[in-house]
Amino acid sequence: AIETGDLETGRKYINMIRERAKNTQHVKTMDQSQDAANYKVGVYDEPFKSKNEAVQALRMERRLEMAHEGIRFFDLVRWGVADEVINAYIAKEKVFRSHLQNAHFVKGKHEYFPIPQSMIDICGTEEMKHNPGY
């Protein structure tokens, strides 16, 4: 809805997710005897002021809702912000993680995965070419 400009419907859908997330009856301890979460999740009471504000709210909600699902990278690539977000993360984390000292995300290359050479060998180089940057 947000991408088509219907910010109010987008806000409604985001708030539905937030209402469900803060409902602790869905998050119980293993024996189901007590709440396992103490979320402080609020809804968006005011209409979004702009499409950009709505998009940012949607992206944050998706980040929270889909945490640990293994799809964040693909969201960042689809939204065209992978280089910005990943390089900001690397810049912050390399202070604490020595293996990130020379790491960087290369826009136009790292959005893609290399095609296994075995597949290129099977198909032939005329039919199948490597992704850009590989």
Predicted regions and their residues:
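Acidic/polar-rich alpha-helix caps and helix-coil junctions
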Residues: 1-134
